[in-house]
């Protein structure tokens, strides 16, 4: 017996194809390099979900996960044939399901993935010791941030800027007279002049839901 087509209503963020390509590139890179245990499903692997372009499963624990559905050809009667959309859902194996917004999804992901400041980070920073940095700043958006967190972020950003200036100065001191090593270091510090200095993404970029849905319209 043929299964009857059923319609559902859900929250969808309209996004551009460029946003999807950028986010998917970051995620698939980290999946291939085993940095993230996320699951990527092609459209032909998703059954009975029409207009689903692809799907990502983000496990949070043994009992729950976030599901990211990327849709295409939205609302053809409005002429949105080339439009794409993103739906975010939270699932619990006991049967609970709800829609989540990008900010909430990022905070949930940050709890299970990516490093963050520890309780001892302030003391370690004051003593000049090494401490764990927050590598997923998107996970703190929308929160009322404490003075300790704001101080750590400002201090960490200062360290990164000083490190970048030091590396650029060292590379410049090598000069082009130092042979291939000097030329390579100078190019690395100054960036390529042949193409745009803005890369589409790099290996250190985060697969944030805000990155995927930013600029999209809630429909």
From Swiss-Prot:
GO terms for cellular component: host cell cytoplasm; host cell plasma membrane; membrane; virion component. A motif (HCCH motif) lies at residues 110-140. It comes from Simian immunodeficiency virus agm.grivet (isolate AGM gr-1). Processed in virion by the viral protease. Highly phosphorylated on serine and threonine residues. Keywords: Host cell membrane, Host cytoplasm, Host membrane, Host-virus interaction, Membrane, Phosphoprotein, Ubl conjugation, Ubl conjugation pathway, Virion. Its main location: host cell. Vif-defective viruses show catastrophic failure in reverse transcription due to APOBEC-induced mutations that initiate a DNA base repair pathway and compromise the structural integrity of the ssDNA. In the absence of Vif, the virion is morphologically abnormal. Pfam families: Vif. Residues 153-165 are annotated as: Multimerization. This is Virion infectivity factor. The BC-like-box motif mediates the interaction with elongin BC complex. The HCCH motif (H-x(5)-C-x(18)-C-x(5)-H) mediates the interaction with CUL5. It is a peripheral membrane protein. The keyword Metal-binding does not apply. InterPro entries: Vif. It comes from the Viruses.
């Amino acid at each position: 017996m043929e299964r009857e087509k059923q319609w559902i209503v859900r929250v969808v963020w309209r996004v551009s194809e460029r946003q999807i390509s950028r986010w998917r590139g970051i995620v698939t890179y980290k999946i291939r390099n085993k940095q993230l245990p996320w699951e990527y499903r092609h459209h032909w692997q998703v059954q009975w979900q029409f207009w689903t372009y692809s799907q990502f499963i983000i496990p949070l624990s043994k009992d729950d996960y976030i599901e990211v559905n990327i849709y295409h050809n939205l609302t053809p009667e409005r002429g949105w044939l080339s439009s794409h959309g993103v739906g975010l859902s939270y699932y619990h194996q006991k049967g609970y399901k709800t829609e989540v917004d990008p900010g909430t999804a990022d905070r949930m992901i940050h709890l299970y993935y990516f490093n963050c400041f520890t309780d001892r980070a302030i003391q370690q920073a004051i003593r000049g010791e090494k401490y764990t940095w927050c590598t997923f700043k998107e996970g703190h958006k929308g929160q009322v941030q404490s003075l300790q967190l704001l101080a750590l972020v400002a201090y960490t950003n200062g360290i990164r800027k000083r490190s970048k200036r030091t590396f650029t100065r060292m590379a410049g001191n090598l000069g082009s007279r130092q042979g291939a090593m000097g030329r390579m270091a100078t190019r690395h510090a100054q960036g390529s002049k042949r193409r745009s200095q803005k890369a589409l993404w790099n290996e250190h970029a985060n697969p944030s839901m805000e990155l995927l849905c930013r600029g999209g319209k809630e429909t």
